[in-house]
Amino acid sequence: MAGRQPQQALPKAAAKQIAKEVVKQEKKEPVVRKKKQFYPNPKFNNRFNKKFVKKQLDKNLKKQGFEGPKPRFAVTVSATIGKVGPNKSQGPELQISTFMHPSLMKEPNDGTNFGPLQSAAAQWGLWRLKNLSVTFTPLVGPSAVTGSVFRISLNMAQSPGATSWGGLGARKHKDVAVGKQFTWKLQKGDLTGPRETWWLTDTNEEGAQSCGPLLEIHGLGETTSTYKDAAWAGDLFIVEVRGRWEFANYNSKPALGMLERVTETTNASIEVANGNMIMTVPQNSQLARHMSERFERTTNASTVGETIWQIVDEGAGLVANVAPPPFTWLIKGGWWFVKKLLGRSANTDVQYLVYASLADAQNNRPVEAQNYTKVTRQTTLSSTQINAPNTGPNTTTGSIGNNNQQWPIPPTGVPVGDFYVCGRMTTLHMGGQSGIQATTLVNGMIYRTDHPEPSTSPVSNWEFTVLENNTIVGAGMGCVWFQKSEALVWTLDGQKLSGWNTLDGVGTTQLTVAWRQHNRTIYGWANVVAWNSEEWHTNAEQPHQPILRLTYWLVKINVLSEPEDFDVVQKSPLAYLEDYTTAQSKSAIQKLNFQTFQKPEGGGTLRAQYSTTPRQGDFAVIWQIGRHNFDMSTGKGTPVESLSDYVMPQQKDAHIGMWYRALTSVGPRSDVLTLHFHLPTVEKDLVEQIIDQIQHRYRLTPLDSDSDSSSSDSDFEPEDRFEKLKIYEGLRSSGLSHHVSDGAAIAVKKKLRRGHAE
């Protein structure tokens, strides 16, 4: 108790010493500490893993070469592939069938239009689609039509097959309801090619390796109008595609960018002769000129061409009426391939061998079927050039004259000023008896004194009335009609041919035509395009006699109207000689009056029989002959009212081409006519006219007026630059110098940017 005991301090010192030794030992042997475990958000972790795995998979696929070469060029393009029309029957009907190949992705009747997609196809050896969207834009509301549904499907086989609605459903497909906008999106995996996801660009190679997948659109059920008890006649959808095409392996083949596509309504036939199925089209049709021998190697032998054409029966005229066994399924499928039979006479219709698949066409294995009698039907055919035997640059192999112009020359542009139209024109109706087919009475002029209700627009006593708003400015006593594809159009400068044109894109005036049928009047049936008028004698020759004038109008039909036969008063011009003696024969006066046609069994009427009906987009010529006024500058005048005698002096020299047809009562139902028309003057200066023609030639459209008009050429979008390049190249190819072509291209682009603001 007398102080701290020494024996108690010893253990404490020993403890400190032991602690020091332990620290030294720990420094020599470091302790492995347990790492802190990280627990991330599960959602973030899953997303991270998916991206990581996809990235690694893509990396490994590219590393191992499963996706082929790396894309060297890519372009995104929008294109209209056609319109979907009404179904004419209950069964599945093919509306559109088109390859996704970049050279074949063209609008109907686009010809050899050279776009960015075709430009790339002409320069690269491999192609593929990264993505594709197909948009259906309705042209009619859902309440206007009923009875039909449409199905778009992807065909990877490059050949037609037996089509059923259930079979189409077994493909990758989507159904589209009428009247609603719809977009179908396809991804890279749906469109991949056979060569490490790539397709060959050269369509002369095996079809399964080059042409790519097809888009097919079918309709089921007859399309009818909900407003009236009748079939629907208008289009239902416009179909557009937008996709991104990728290219690799540069390999220039210029001809692949110039493959053509043409759509035409014409008479086509199918037959089986000597065991081979043959398709025939008229020699003067646009399709025959399109699928001509200019694409073939020169030969005089009777052989088969090398160019392959895809034929799509969009009008279903052959599909519904032709069934050659055992290949009924091929025609019913709505599309096939053909090659031209060479060495045939130039004065006969053009024949093509039919093939069931692209591979058969490439290997020249035509369809072999039982003998089948030739069947001809009117239908709408779409022809697409699949390949070009010569893929190099085009060279002129034959020319006529010293201008190195290769024939045949395709028509381009619309006529300017006075022009001529030559073609087979058909009488609208014939005169006959009920139940008896009319054969020769071609100029029955329907004359009716009864008029529609006062609430409607006024009409004349004749079958057709030319109107400006609600004012009568002319009448049509007779009518012939023709298809624009069967007409030749040209302009003359004295004795020289100054233009070889087409009626595609020709403008119309504000004058309209009303058509009086049996129990209704079709207002706005057509619009006036051009006209002409000529007198047979003047007041100076016979002041006391009524003036005989012939006036006719070229009109473009707007409405498809199916008339019905009916009995009506019909008159016809009848030329005759007055009573005269032999001594007075040299001074005899010819006269013209209008005589009423009568039935043989009596009565003052005759049946108007309509054997053919013009369609929307066709053209017609209506005329009136007799006493009336007319202004050539405006195309307006007065209708013929007087039916009294007209004196016709001798030695008349006519210049219009219509007198013989207007003065005859008996003749063939159709004949070839050549008519002279006057095109109304457009108040534009020379520069405006040239720019308008360039716009029509290259299918350019003005930009919105609110776009930046002050931007320079360097601010143009790539599409604008390409359009400017198209204009420049076209002007250079026509023989203009660089400075003139470049200046004109810039002027056109500035006008396009101004739009309609002016």
UniProtKB/Swiss-Prot annotation:
Taxonomy, superkingdom: Viruses
Region feature Inner core, mapped onto this chain: 63-255
Record keywords, A-Z: Capsid protein, Clathrin-mediated endocytosis of virus by host, T=3 icosahedral capsid protein, Viral penetration into host cytoplasm, Virion, Virus endocytosis by host, Virus entry into host cell
Site (Cleavage): 298-299, 347-348
Effect of residue 519 to T: In strain: VS34
GO biological process: clathrin-dependent endocytosis of virus by host cell
Phosphoprotein as UniProt keyword: no
Record region (Disordered): 21-43
Consequence when changing residue 613 to S: In strain: VS34
Record-level GO cellular component terms: T=3 icosahedral viral capsid
Basic and acidic residues bias spans: 21-32
Region (Basic): 1-62
Any further remark recorded for this protein: The Human astrovirus VA1 is a neurotropic virus.
Similarity remark: Belongs to the astroviridae capsid polyprotein family.
Protein name, per record: Capsid polyprotein VP86
UniProt organism field: Human astrovirus VA1
